[in-house]
């Protein structure tokens, strides 16, 4: 009830420090005081009625201050994206010059910050030793003694994304499909702006190409079931799908469901590096093949498939090509035109956006790609995904895509440095370790390691202050060895010894040091 009162009473009296403790609750120190804090700073709704909306810009500029109580006494402004990060002088020493790499492939060269540091590694050390955009202060992470390195399971919301979402969780609450008044128009525009941001991230051409869903699982189901059932109805002979043995579970389970409906599925085995051979795909295509689906970046071992050549092959053979890019979007450059991608699944919470929102890209081309809807109702999303759109989640998803477009190059340099740092340290200090998956064609924010003779689950339990995983979060409740590792030829015993480490935009050097030391 108190939270409802917060939304209702939106006028501020003491704007200066209104949300300090709320933002600082990430340290779990002020949670019990949040309601009291807000109720003391919100009073009436007069300001809301002036122009139909609160002056959110002034509200944030005056209230969202972060870090005034930090150990160095500095004040960081959440709205402007300025955050101080302090790196511990730990006991781990690796030659940083070795990892300087300014030639990383990316189509993003601009950075949305006011710092002179634009992502270049200089002689003083890696870029994240400077003042960079990072929501969590290094000293606070030390104080919490809890470190998150499970970024393939989910990522934290970027503060710029949260900032963009807040108005749509409070006073901009119209239904995007209410076409008769300002509230609906305002929400509809926000949704279309988010579509544009997603298109810009992947080089799409038309806003109608983006269909919002609840996440990558729904997007994958809609792509596979929607396409196969539609084209099979037109031609009963068309009933063949090609995929790989190392897809995400939601692809594999959807294919198994289609098999119960009479469809034929070919599961291709990758090589020992986790890469599917182009010749194997070519040899699997038959006259009755409808589509091929291959994961862009593998969620367990981080390997990047040869998506462009697969797309070209599918175009040449006149079959549809779908890719699950939930681990790739916002992290590696994607050009759906150049790569000839017909359908692509994305997820908000894998690129520093909110959970519960995803999208399916469907290319506009001639002849048009057709598919059957899975959810029926009011006809939203061009009739392919009925249901009221969650405007705040869509806005967050779109803003996350926009931020990724600006910062992908710098993020890639950061995670690549951490990957090489950990790899060199472990190789130097430990015997009997294996780095799984191709070490070249990969996303460097994902590291999968087998520690021979050490049970992976036991290792995770011994590192209880560091969040890691032994595989996909969707299957982590089982004690079975990773089916991905088994598919690339790793024995069951060794597969049981593997753990996955995930670096991200907000990973700090101190966290990486603690991982290595422990």
Q: Language model features by range: what are they?
A:
Residues 1-73, 77-90:
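N-terminal mitochondrial targeting presequence
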Residues 21, 61, 71, 77, ...:
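A periodicity- and composition-biased signal for non-globular, repetitive helical segments
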Residues 74, 105-106, 113-118:
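Intrinsically disordered, low-complexity regions enriched in glycine and serine
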């Amino acid at each position: 009830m108190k939270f409802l009162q917060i939304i209702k009473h939106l006028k501020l009296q003491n704007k200066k420090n209104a949300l300090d403790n709320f933002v600082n609750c990430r340290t779990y120190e002020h949670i019990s005081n949040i309601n009291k804090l807000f109720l003391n700073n919100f009073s009436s709704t007069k300001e809301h009625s002036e122009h139909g909306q609160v002056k959110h810009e002034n509200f944030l500029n005056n209230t969202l201050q972060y870090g005034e109580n930090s150990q160095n006494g500095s004040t960081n402004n959440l709205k402007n994206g300025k955050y101080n990060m302090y790196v511990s002088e730990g006991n781990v020493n690796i030659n940083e010059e070795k990892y300087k790499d300014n030639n990383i492939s990316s189509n993003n060269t601009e950075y949305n910050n006011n710092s002179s540091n634009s992502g270049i590694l200089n002689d003083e050390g890696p870029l994240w030793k400077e003042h960079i955009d990072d929501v969590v202060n290094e000293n606070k992470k030390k104080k919490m003694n809890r470190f998150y390195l499970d970024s393939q399971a989910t990522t934290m919301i970027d503060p710029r994304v949260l900032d963009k979402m807040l108005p749509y969780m409070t006073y901009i609450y119209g239904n995007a499909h209410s076409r008769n008044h300002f509230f609906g128009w305002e929400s509809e525009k926000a949704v279309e702006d988010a579509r544009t941001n997603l298109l810009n991230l992947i080089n799409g051409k038309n806003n109608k190409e983006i269909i919002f869903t609840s996440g990558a699982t729904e997007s994958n189901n809609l792509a596979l079931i929607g396409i196969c059932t539609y084209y099979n109805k037109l031609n009963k002979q068309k009933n063949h799908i090609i995929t790989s043995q190392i897809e995400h579970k939601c692809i594999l389970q959807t294919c198994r469901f289609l098999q119960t409906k009479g469809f034929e599925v070919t599961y291709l085995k990758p090589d020992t590096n986790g890469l599917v051979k182009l010749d194997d795909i070519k040899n699997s295509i038959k006259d009755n093949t409808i589509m091929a689906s291959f994961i862009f970046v593998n969620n367990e071992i981080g390997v990047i498939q040869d998506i462009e050549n697969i797309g070209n092959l599918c175009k040449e053979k006149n079959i549809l090509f779908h890719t699950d890019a939930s681990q790739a979007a916002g992290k590696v450059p994607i050009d759906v035109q150049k790569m000839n991608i017909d359908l692509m699944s994305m997820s908000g919470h894998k690129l520093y956006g909110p959970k519960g929102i995803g999208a399916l890209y469907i290319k506009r081309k001639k002849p048009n790609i057709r598919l059957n809807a899975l959810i029926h109702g009011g006809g939203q999303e061009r009739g392919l995904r009925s249901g009221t759109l969650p405007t705040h989640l869509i806005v967050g998803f779109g803003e996350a895509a926009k931020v990724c477009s600006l910062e992908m190059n710098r993020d890639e340099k950061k995670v690549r440095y951490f990957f090489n740092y950990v790899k060199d340290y472990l190789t130097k200090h430990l015997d009997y370790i294996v780095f799984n998956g191709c070490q070249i064609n990969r996303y460097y924010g994902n590291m999968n390691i087998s520690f021979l003779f050490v049970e992976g689950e036991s290792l995770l339990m011994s590192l209880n202050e560091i969040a890691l995983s032994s595989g996909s979060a969707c299957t982590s409740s089982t004690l079975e060895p990773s089916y991905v590792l088994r598919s690339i030829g790793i024995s069951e015993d060794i597969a049981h010894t593997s753990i996955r480490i995930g670096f991200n935009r907000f990973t700090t050097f101190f966290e990486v040091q603690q991982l290595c030391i422990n």
